[in-house]
Amino acid sequence: MKPKIFIDGEHGTTGLQIRTRMAGRTDLELLSIPEAERRNAAMREDLLNSADIAILCLPDDASREAVAMVAGNNRVRIIDTSTAHRVAPDWAYGFAEMDKAQPRKIRDARHVANPGCYPTGAIALIRPLRQAGILPDGYPVTVNAVSGYTGGGKQMIAQIEDDKSPDHIRAPHFLYGLTLKHKHVPEMKMHGLLERAPVFSPSVGKFAQGMIVQVPLYVDDLAAGATIESIHRALVDHYAGQSIVEVVPLEESAKLARIDATELAGKDTMKLFVFGTDGGAHVNMVALLDNLGKGASGAAVQNMDLMLSA
């Protein structure tokens, strides 16, 4: 029998993207709820309990509610795309390239927390340096990022695309999270293996999909002997053999004059770059991805496929 997949929240931005990625797949049976019934709790509960894998594309509280609906059904497995369970110790973190053992953990898990878009880029850069001993305990990590506006969901999409809206956002680029309490910080700290929470400054650009995440470093404050080459080598070694995460060669990065945040829009891959000053005193690590691709829906489908391979 074909595995049954239910996307709870399929009419939202992430849910629609997941549904698009599954279109044409004959190996799955997709369960669906009419948009008019999406708030029908009884119908949702029935579909959740009928699924082999339920993918939750809901706000945090609604995701917790959905998990409770299948609490007594050990057959149903869950992928949650909200922030509700990303630092929960009994949930597998759905960044398959994070560690060599992570694909197996995802494959065998009943509950998988899909990573956030910003943390996907930040953790991809930070964790290999922590594991290689290059980034010391207590280093004051800073993460700067810009995302396509689709990351804000239907509300922000309308605010930017509808110039007749009273809430129309005219600015081509804006900062938010100004209190430095963004909901993605805890997972950056936990899965980035950091002792101190990073200072995270997110922003949104007037483009639909795409993302740049930057982690700047003072080389003199890293482990003794650290260089741009050793930082790059740590990333290369960590992602060796991975098809989704590409570490761009140093010589190729050195030829670049700019990076376009939309380069990977519509793709489920990620590129990592390492840039540095001529004297080697400063390094800037950069992750490039689609906020709706590897940063959300693409990762959810990747995790689903890993779970189905069990």
Swiss-Prot record:
Name the top EC class.
oxidoreductase
Which InterPro entries has this protein been placed in? AGPR_AS, AGPR_type-2, NAD(P)-bd_dom_sf, NAGSA_dehydrogenase, Semialdehyde_DH_NAD-bd
Q: What is its main location?
A: cytoplasm
Source organism per entry reads Sinorhizobium medicae (strain WSM419) (Ensifer medicae)
- By what name is this protein known? N-acetyl-gamma-glutamyl-phosphate reductase
GO biological process terms held by the UniProt record: L-arginine biosynthetic process
- Pfam hit, one: Semialdhyde_dhC_1
Q: Which CDD domains match?
A: AGPR_2_C, AGPR_2_N
Quick one: a GO cellular component term?
A: cytoplasm
Spell out the PROSITE patterns in the cross-references: ARGC
Q: Which residues form a coiled coil?
A: none
Q: In which pathway does it act?
A: Amino-acid biosynthesis; L-arginine biosynthesis; N(2)-acetyl-L-ornithine from L-glutamate: step 3/4
User: Active site located where?
Assistant: C117
Taxonomic path: Bacteria, Pseudomonadati, Pseudomonadota, Alphaproteobacteria, Hyphomicrobiales
Q: What is its EC number?
A: 1.2.1.38
Q: Which family does it belong to?
A: Belongs to the NAGSA dehydrogenase family. Type 2 subfamily.
Is Membrane found in the keyword set? no
Q: What does this protein do?
A: Catalyzes the NADPH-dependent reduction of N-acetyl-5-glutamyl phosphate to yield N-acetyl-L-glutamate 5-semialdehyde.
Supply the alphabetized keyword list.
Answer: Amino-acid biosynthesis, Arginine biosynthesis, Cytoplasm, NADP, Oxidoreductase
What would you give as a GO molecular function for this chain, any one?
N-acetyl-gamma-glutamyl-phosphate reductase activity
Catalyses: N-acetyl-L-glutamate 5-semialdehyde + phosphate + NADP(+) = N-acetyl-L-glutamyl 5-phosphate + NADPH + H(+)
Subcellular localization, as worded in the UniProt entry: Cytoplasm
Family annotation (SMART domains): Semialdhyde_dh
